[in-house]
Curated annotation (Swiss-Prot):
Lineage: Eukaryota, Metazoa, Chordata, Craniata, Vertebrata
Gene: MTMR12
Name by which UniProt lists this protein: Myotubularin-related protein 12
Self-association and partners: Heterodimer with lipid phosphatase MTM1. Heterodimer with lipid phosphatase MTMR2.
Segments for region (Disordered): 1-21
Coarse class of the protein's main subcellular location: cytoplasm
Domain Myotubularin phosphatase: 205-643
CDD domains (UniProt xref): PTP-MTMR12
Modification type Phosphoserine: residues: 564, 601, 716
Amino acid sequence: MLGKGVVGGGGGTKGPKPSFVSYVRPEEIHTNEKEVTEKEVTLHLLPGEQLLCEASTVLKYVQEDSCQHGVYGRLVCTDFKIAFLGDDESALDNDETQFKNKVIGENDITLHCVDQIYGVFDEKKKTLFGQLKKYPGKLIIHCKDFRVFQFCLGYTKEEEVKRIVSGIIHHTQAPKLLKRLFLFSYATAAQNNTVTDPKNHTVMFDTLKDWCWELERTKGNMKYKAVSVNEGYKVCERLPAYFVVPTPLPEENVQRFQGHGIPIWCWSCHNGSALLKMSALPKEQDDGILQIQKSFLDGIYKTIHRSPYEIVKTEDVSSNFLSLQEIQTAYSKFKQLFLTDNSTEFWDTDIKWFSLLESSSWLDIIRRCLKKAIEITECMEAQNMNVLLLEENASDLCCLISSLVQLMMDPHCRTRIGFQSLIQKEWVMGGHCFLDRCNHLRQNDKEEVPVFLLFLDCVWQLVHQHPPAFEFTETYLTVLSDSLYIPIFSTFFFNSPHQKDANMGREGQDAQSKPLNLLTVWDWSVQFEPKAQTLLKNPLYVEKPKLDKGQRKGMRFKHQRQLSLPLTQSKSSPKRGFFREETDHLIKNLLGKRISKLINSSDELQDNFREFYDSWHSKSTDYHGLLLPHIEGPEIKVWAQRYLRWIPEAQILGGGQVATMSKLLEMMEEVQSLQEKIDERHHSQQVPQAEAPCLLRNSARLSSLFPFALLQRHSSKPVLPTSGWKALGDEDDLAKREDEFVDLGDV
């Protein structure tokens, strides 16, 4: 499997020494160097990509059974990627189509995808950083997409070892300037031959027209308006040039505190309720300024809270929910479960897998995010309340929660175009700091927090539990997570729309120079061929049938709320237990004196949530209506395709969901074939039908983690450690003792 091998040392686990060391002498390698070089794969460079350093006579370890095997070749480092060029080691040198990325090869690592670099010195594994006095004999690279690469440098010339190791460390770990990113080199070199997919209708939300269209789509244009007060970013560099605010709000209010303290519209529900977000005002000590802020917020609150017609519930996600530090700490522990260097290390951790998983708290954080989104959905759907999300800059957890709420409530967001437009609206235009949160510049490790990856994991839970409700697949989500680290797309490499426009040459540009044309990640034709793109689309998804005008007229008298939910009695505004006026709740939150736990009755909120949650799950699911996930402990699962795809021992050959999907596609093809014959008889012509990917037609040749892990050329024979079973202390259990020595090679 790609990137797997056994390292002698590291983590206290010693694997067997390489079998080929006893049979291949360094002299023989150098003698045959010319012959081997002829077989090497050619280095393909993207426009603007430059070779920085390289080393020959490098062995890349490939795990095969319980032994070690190596592939001979060159290790190179460019200003875009680290690449290994050796003999063709494809597991399937055949006619079968593979799910290949046109930008990144299976032995390529973009510089931004490198997580940690280790060196092995005398059987000891050490983290590499800065200037080295001594260079390792083995190089181990852990990637952010969970690949693990191991290279033996024992036969490489000393000068080449120094050059390649120092180059890789410097270009992956040293702080960078934004303008030094490969993104700009590529855009400059490929400016004339950049192509875009004409079928990509993703709404980018970079024009006033896009926001007006979204208001009209959600029927929010009766109460909200799109404004251009920040055009040219003259009010606030953090906000997009265009956004939506409540209609009664004067535009001069937006300018008063540079966009802080302003309710910005996210989405409107069919019953008239809306989801809003707001960034907190700067904390002040001066009583005079505090009074001005209080008066300002009082006017803002009266704009959005008009009892009894419109009631606003505030959710402070920065103080009463999750902290960014919690997310980062949990993910750091969680990812270590999947970055194993060899089979022995994998099986050693297998016996304590669940305890390690639980101690990371990552799945619990996912559950808490989904629960919070359901709570907000209940307020909007069942109680017809507006919800205002509060956060310091409204660009992290606000993005996450508002996106999840829209996924649950709006079926349009569950289409591929709708989902991409949602990310553009809430994350890209919402000012999520991708550059800092992904630490692309390596300038501040403390700012690195995988908020967007947490969002994708939450979305995967929904996709996994309700597959027919989504037009896209888990494979789509996986390649989207990988695209975070490919610096030819501008989508995930800026902190704000202003930063992007300023560095593209759109602000203060020369008359002769024209702005750079940066690619968007939503143009999937850049990464995948059309046949591979079929794996991004869910064949089980069925679009909602469109009603004709006659049917629409007949349904106008019906209430717009989902009929599958129980009708609840109208409820008064939330209890006020500390302040006389609800407006003080908002003011206290935004002025930094947050005590919202004392305001709302937790018992009432819990009862409302449980009633709403249980009632929805007791009914049959309308995949084109409201969609709620199960959030009980066992229902929140590990996203196996993303986290386990490079671990051979974690795969089920010919099994898993891919086997089920294969059978379903066979049935669909049969139905389509019959439909074609019927259409031929009626219309005397053949109607073209979508064809299932050929790779799915024989599930016995596929892995459960398809399409990233196909049937391996060599069988895998895991050696189960006896130390783990002895730790159980039950030596009389014959079954357990026998299982230690079961040979799985012939199964």
